Amino acid sequence: MAKGRTPRSFSQRYGKWNAKFTAFSNPTVASTILTNVAPIAQGNFQTNVPKFTSVNEQVSAVLTQYGVTGPSRAIYQGYGLKVARALNRIGAGPALTNMVAGLKAYYVSAYGANPEILDAVTNIILGSPTGYVS
């Protein structure tokens, strides 16, 4: 689904690390690691999949509103997921603003994306136009 880091607490990170590396003393290492890590990975998956599914649905609604059809939708869906991953990884603030500005410039120059639609996608993901100034 989505690549990139997702925010995890120290206890989640330690739990996964502990489950992985205590298993190396067992001869069936791969099986043991997967068995021990599965509940933690499933929890992370269940936490983050709804976020990115919601992003896809929201971006799709914006694209329908602007009349974007066919393969062009993939450009804006990809942009939306990149913005959502950046928000998930680094949170709101100046770093996110810089990241979004760079992504927008890249998508405009590389893919010929419409800046107005990119702004609409950004605003729907960040929750408010006040969170991003184009």
Swiss-Prot record:
Keyword annotations: DNA-binding, Virion
Annotated InterPro entries: Sulfobus_virus_coat_C
Complexes and interactors: Homodimer.
Coarse class of the protein's main subcellular location: virion
Keyword match Membrane: no
GO cellular component term of the entry, any: helical viral capsid
UniProt free text on domains: The N-terminus projects into a DNA groove.
Stretch forming the signal peptide: none
Protein name per the record: Major capsid protein
Localization terms from the record: Virion
Function: Self-assembles to form a helical, filamentous nucleocapsid. The capsid proteins wrap around the DNA and maintain it in an A-form by non-specific desolvation and specific coordination of the DNA phosphate groups by positively charged residues. This certainly protects the viral DNA under conditions such as the extreme desiccation of its host.
Organism: Saccharolobus solfataricus rod-shaped virus 1 (SSRV1)
A single MF term (Gene Ontology): DNA binding
